């Protein structure tokens, strides 16, 4: 080393020494304290500020007082003049108290997921926790970012989704849809996604979900289609769904007369007088005469749709058109001349002609003329347009709509459905119209239909435009079109949108000379309604509420104010004042802005409920009741106010003078006066010189000639009741008074021409003939008594004829409509099919069991049965339906039971549970379809295949998780480890000293050898050899399996483990090849002995270096007991009492044992210490004692030569042990382990095979059907009762039951036999063990458990419980007696009783009322009898008749009294003396005829003419009177001569 290098080395040593001196002394084993963390500051990475509440204490000062008394000297007290007194003193001092308050302070901490390390400014290290990372993020402790996110998520905690669609649209051709953690591509309609999941391919749009069409899809192009409906349907507005066309819309449903839609089907009806033909379409005339429906008194003449009654000669047809009356006097038909003055129909009455109008017309005020009714004013039918026609109206629709099938509503016409409406590309249907549009890259033509590419040359907008000749006062200015294509960076979409906006050249006309308007014809002088001229004199400045060029238009709806620029804020249909904007609310709505209310047609708290108020009516906000406009009323505002009522709710009474008023306005109550009257209430007549309605017309009569105030005619004033030039004509019908100028107010009846008193026609009464006759009266003056009409019929107040209710006919309405007819006068034929019964009044069909519908033509829907399908089925929901007639449940596949409430028994499925399941290996069978649900470990249609290798569990969906090539259990996935492996996943090798399957075998390896974990082969430690490593290496060999040869020379011995040579004295070297020289041997090797036991002599020190297991100066002593190895430093681990080898540590086992822990007995064939001796036992199966080597027979053998096996039932050494195997199992002669026979398993064969298993060790699976067991030995199926077949796959045949189906069933009357035990399940109506007994009276149904509910001694059908009604009753429970007019079984018999007599509902016998008798009560009581059955006799004097009902005597004229035994009193006459005489002059009247018997010179019919003779007061006359009388007063004789005295 050079001097320079030595100097440098010395310098480094000095520096190192200084460093070591300067370092603090740290004791050995002491820990270094952690470095403090830097304080966190705002703004540092991952530092979060948090608020926390802390208690802060502080001292709060308070003033306190202390009071006490002090002694003081006081003067003037006591005998010494001084004394000691006490005074109170108070001392104030300052105290403090501790006060705590809660304060919030900001604390800086590491954000969640981060922590701070020493010397870090902030929180820079990740801190992992279970809930730190979201969406499957992985936390890496100490990393720069706490969470490592999976693809699709980002953020420090993976809390944010990555929107892949933001970058290049995610690679999608059409649409990119972002999803949490991923994304997906979608295609536009008409395309489908390609296999790359990014590009889109065009598809046949009809092939995908039928194009969304409900019926047919018609492909137009590869991406466009059109929906089409089946015949009888039409396309809805959505272009996809179809609705059924009204069957009446097409040719009136093929009906001749009327077509009605009933439950979606066309139902033809005929007018009155016609009946439906057999084809259900045509209408045939009903021959009322032949059917007996006319009820004409004399003759009947059939006409089309009606009939006409005719009378015999000398008779005239009555007003009812049926009765005939003898002609007593000449009757003039008031309708023969000029149709009675009627413009349409005329009917002759006793009061004169009665005018009638056809439908759609009404009588005018003259009661003669028919005027058309404006049906559009009252009809709520038409939705859009209503056109009134004479006698009717017609609905119409706006352009773009068509009339609905009901003739009222309007449907939008889908113009796009037909050739796309003429659009070249796309057509969009709108309400009442349509709109064409173009695809991308095209623009719409001027015709608004065609499309042209944007690449087409544009019109040269900069070219010369055609010259336009200016109009007078007009200048034409042309605007330049903005440049179509600009250079600025505008997106392609905006460019295209701009181009499709159709830029066109515009022209603007400018008026000159202060004119304006479209033709420059207006000036400021034309401004109206307060409008002023604008400053430029080019228009009008309109005031509030007005708009338009000249302010002649009111503001448009929903605007108001100046220039109509303000929007109204009125809600719920309110209208606003065009000037002020104030809201006018409709009925039912209030508030400043009409906010307290709902829009038209809705109500409720949230205005979500619908109401249906006609005629623009609104409904109550809360209750939905209709709030009608003035003039309307009714539940739905569909009625106009009655006469002389008006206003909201028709609550106001018109104040018009009714006789002078034509009508009263229903809305505001204003009066429309009749001709000749005027005034607000029509209270005044016309002033002179005026006439007509309202008196607005001026008369044109000459001066002095009166003018008729009604007609304006000139003429003289005729007396009341007359008119004409000479006042010789009576007032025409309907007028009265002076000049017949007043109109009768008699409701169409005539009135007295002078007084105006009404002459009411038959059936009317009252001052104005507005009242009908009272109940029970008819005719003129309502003087006639109505006949006894039956069945709630009333009599016609005009004719007295009974007006039958629908369903009844006859002169007294006593007959019910004949079968097959119903309605008024029984003129409509019933349409009930399938044995349905027709109600005689309404025609409503009462359907037979199993049928329903208007005409009983529709079978019961699923879930209902019985008459009119009125009974709900009592079958388990969804598991079965019931028979429409009987109600018995018809079970769906997979269900049985009376209500189909039970699933098929195990092993059966399908309809009636008649099919056998074919599932194997214990799989569950679906009771409906028979589909197999495989248990874990099996797959296949019938679960016949085990799981493939590597899979297990249900449907073999789970993959095995075993290592080392181990297979897994197909059921639970547990690993089946191969030999040498163990653990749940077979990931562990066998522990030491074990090998084989499940490491269950013990290794037979000794002297520290290891064994192969698979087959147990020993791997010997160095120095040992042999199968069990029991043999030490022979001399000259060492190492593994003693394969190496020793190299020791000169008598040296080698270590059998390491091969090291132990040299004899005088020799040294690795192979003892060197001879020791005197100078080479140090003191330790000086002695002749040298180092012993293989010890080596250290050439430097001369000390012996002892090998393992030896100690001492010359290595002469082995290790002390309990120690071994190098320097005897290792402690032995042998069991107590066993020494260990001082070199290897191997335990020195007692004779007969071996192993590292002496835990194993000597292997067979060896014995003694270390099992080193070999047994020398003779015989075939010997065994020697492992310790002593004494010979004996091996376990399982006996005999002198050990050649005999143990007899059955014994095992072990000397065959001394008894076997414990059951069920015929045999045991191993050596170990006693049981070998079970077929069908058994267990340690002692005590267990039979579990259900479903059989064979050796129960390894085979039974193939029997569910519910069947199999023989555990042979696998033969043991069928349960009711099953048969090799695999019990068949049920018993009919009428067989029991085990093997060997027994015959004994069920009768259709009873079902239980296949298992033969018990009978009786059908409805039967009971008993063998179903041999019918249900007793009063019981029915299954097992006769139900009680009949039939009344009136009726019986019930034993199967269904249907009541069998006795005569006179009907109904489901026979609870109703026959209706009046019917009797007998089923109430089919018709009663023919007359005069309103009822009949007995059972026998049909007529129960005659008092006054009648006979079989049909057709005869009245004979004279002299009365009462019920006419059995009572009259008690009247003089043969006077009596009332046949009451027996009261009907006295003849001149007689009275209870028995007609009294003469009439003076002044009375007639029948029963009920009339009063009208005789004057003291005359009496005849008590019979009432004729007056004059006295005292009176004469005349009433004796009021003439009187007694009086003498004159003149004497001359008196004197003459004594001689002769005037000639005129002389009495004459009968012969005409003078009377003789």
Curated annotation (Swiss-Prot):
SMART domains given in the database record: EGF (SM00181), EGF_CA (SM00179), EGF_Lam (SM00180)
**Which cysteine pairs make disulfide bonds?**
48-111, 77-83, 110-123, 128-139, 133-147, 149-158, 165-176, 172-185, 187-200, 242-255, 248-268, 270-283, 289-300, 296-309, 311-324, 416-427, 423-436, 438-451, 520-533, 527-540, 542-551, 564-576, 570-583, 585-594, 607-619, 613-626, 628-637, 740-751, 744-758, 760-769, 786-795, 789-802, 804-813, 826-838, 832-845, 847-856, 869-882, 873-889, 891-900, 913-925, 919-932, 934-943, 999-1011, 1005-1018, 1020-1029, 1042-1054, 1048-1061, 1063-1072, 1085-1097, 1091-1104, 1106-1115, 1128-1140, 1134-1147, 1149-1158, 1215-1227, 1221-1234, 1236-1245, 1258-1270, 1264-1277, 1279-1288, 1301-1313, 1307-1320, 1322-1331, 1348-1356, 1350-1363, 1365-1374, 1387-1399, 1393-1406, 1408-1417, 1473-1485, 1479-1492, 1494-1503
Q: Which organism is it from?
A: Homo sapiens (Human)
Output the SUPFAM superfamilies linked to this UniProt entry: EGF/Laminin, Growth factor receptor domain
**What GO cellular component entries does it have?**
extracellular region
Compositional bias (Polar residues): 1516-1535
Q: Which UniProt keywords apply?
A: Calcium, Disulfide bond, EGF-like domain, Glycoprotein, Repeat, Secreted, Signal
Molecular function in Gene Ontology: calcium ion binding
Highest taxon above the source species: Eukaryota
Concerning InterPro entries, the annotation shows: cEGF, EGF-like_Ca-bd_dom, EGF-like_dom, EGF-type_Asp/Asn_hydroxyl_site, EGF_Ca-bd_CS, EMI_domain, Growth_fac_rcpt_cys_sf, LE_dom
Pfam families recorded: cEGF, EGF_CA, EGF_laminin, FXa_inhibition
Q: Where is the signal peptide?
A: 1-30
Q: Where is this region: Disordered?
A: 1509-1541
What is the name of this protein? Multiple epidermal growth factor-like domains protein 6
Can you give the residue ranges of the EGF-like domain? Answer: 124-159, 161-201, 206-242, 238-284, 285-325, 335-370, 375-411, 412-452, 516-552, 560-595, 603-638, 736-770, 783-814, 822-857, 865-901, 909-944, 955-987, 995-1030, 1038-1073, 1081-1116, 1124-1159, 1211-1246, 1254-1289, 1297-1332, 1345-1375, 1383-1418, 1469-1504
Q: Is Glycosyltransferase included in the keywords of this UniProt record?
A: no
Q: Which residues form the EMI domain?
A: 44-125
Q: Which residues are glycosylated?
A: 252, 739
Query: Gene encoding this chain?
Result: MEGF6
Kindly list the places in or outside the cell where this protein is found, as annotated in its UniProt entry: Secreted
